[in-house]
């Protein structure tokens, strides 16, 4: 990595976020998922991922990255989506927004219009969350799971929390927030971007994107206990995000309960420390970019990665102020998500079916088989261990060799 400093932008990056005009679509108008009772074993080249006659029309763009045959070192479709209308999978109109797992045999994927599914190491099973809203965040707890759509409620499974309604057929219950800070928290002026929490913590952090930069805070905390309804409370002093670029956030991640990273519009990067205390601290960092940062992954307490529009990739290795610029990135498309198993095994996904891999020295573009002429936007990636990668996006979910 080559480290260069843009001193002229340091003060600006710490002072406030810059509004950009466009973000990735989250599929709010797409169709709902089918009933939750269907279970099937994935195959490498079946379902919605098989090319249609329309896919075969026209010339092949970047053919070398899109072979017809699935091999062990190539990403391939892994079932889950249904292009035939038989009801055996998610509609290909759905987008996967987030993938998270506890292990190779316990993986969840969530997305547009209530799309939600679980992989048990062998097969995918659709799970009905109840509300058919776009799901933007997914937390795996000890025990239970939480998914988030709108900024006014949570949807939980396996959590003993007060105020739950009747469960869905998938075992999920919806719980509205008890809002303690109505004076400052306006869910109609904010769009929920994502959520983050340590699996055992009662506190869940919410990252929001304000319609106007600096108009309201983009970081809030949700308190979840078995004895009371979920309560949304202030995480930072009022108007903090007028001075620090935290009003238009898009992604969060951390490796320990006490600290995490949040990134967003205008190249914003902030680090929250003492995250479990009543008085957390927030520090702005210099990303050396004004591009929107749309994904972040924390490798360790001393290393993290973030990705964004126009092929932006930044790497943090402990500097007190500045993130390094990744120099040999082989694309300029918008990038949405980053994950890995270590600093030498990092995966990034984005527009035009672009998947990148970093081996500790160089970035390379990965091949995808079985797409025909399709070049779907890829918006989610999660890695359980080296060689076991899940990638999701518009009407597709992929794995190496099409295998778990």
Identify the function of each model-found stretch:
Residues 1-13:
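Bacterial N-terminal signal peptides that target proteins for export
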Residues 16:
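Metal-dependent phosphoesterase/phosphodiesterase active-site architecture
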Residues 25-30, 34-404:
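Residue-level hotspots at or immediately adjacent to binding/recognition sites across diverse folds
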């Amino acid at each position: 990595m080559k480290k260069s400093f843009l001193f002229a932008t340091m003060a600006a990056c710490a002072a406030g976020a810059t509004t950009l005009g466009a973000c990735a679509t989250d599929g709010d108008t797409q169709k709902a998922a089918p009933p939750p009772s269907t279970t099937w074993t994935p195959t490498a080249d079946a379902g919605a991922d098989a090319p249609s006659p329309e896919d075969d029309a026209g010339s092949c763009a970047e053919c070398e990255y899109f072979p017809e045959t699935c091999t062990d070192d190539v990403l391939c479709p892994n079932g889950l989506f249904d292009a035939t209308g038989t009801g055996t999978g998610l509609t290909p109109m759905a987008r996967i927004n987030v993938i998270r797992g506890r292990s190779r045999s316990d993986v969840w994927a969530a997305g547009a219009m209530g799309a939600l599914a679980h992989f048990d190491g062998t097969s995918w099973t659709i799970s009905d969350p109840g509300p058919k809203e776009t799901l933007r965040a997914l937390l795996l707890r000890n025990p239970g799971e939480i998914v988030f759509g709108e900024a006014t409620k949570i949807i939980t499974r396996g959590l003993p929390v007060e105020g739950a309604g009747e469960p869905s057929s998938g075992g999920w219950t919806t719980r509205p927030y008890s809002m303690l800070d109505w004076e400052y928290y306006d869910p109609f002026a904010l769009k929920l971007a994502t959520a983050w929490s340590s699996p055992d913590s009662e506190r869940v952090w919410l990252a929001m994107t304000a319609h106007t930069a600096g108009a309201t805070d983009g970081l809030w905390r949700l308190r979840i206990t078995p004895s009371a309804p979920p309560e949304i409370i202030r995480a930072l002093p009022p108007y903090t995000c007028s001075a620090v670029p935290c009003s238009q956030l898009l992604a969060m991640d951390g490796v320990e309960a006490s600290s995490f990273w949040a990134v967003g519009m205008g190249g914003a990067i902030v680090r929250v420390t003492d995250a479990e205390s009543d008085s957390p601290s927030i520090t702005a960092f210099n990303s050396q970019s004004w591009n929107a940062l749309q994904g972040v992954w924390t490798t360790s307490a001393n290393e993290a990665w973030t990705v964004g529009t126009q092929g932006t990739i930044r790497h943090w290795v402990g500097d007190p102020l500045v993130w390094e610029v990744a120099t040999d990135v082989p694309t300029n498309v918008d990038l949405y998500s980053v994950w890995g198993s270590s600093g030498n095994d990092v995966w990034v996904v984005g527009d035009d079916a672009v998947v990148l891999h970093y081996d500790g020295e160089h970035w390379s573009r990965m091949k995808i088989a079985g797409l025909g002429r399709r070049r779907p936007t890829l918006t989610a990636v999660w890695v359980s261990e080296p060689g076991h990668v899940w990638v999701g996006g518009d009407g597709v979910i992929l794995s190496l060799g099409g295998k778990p």
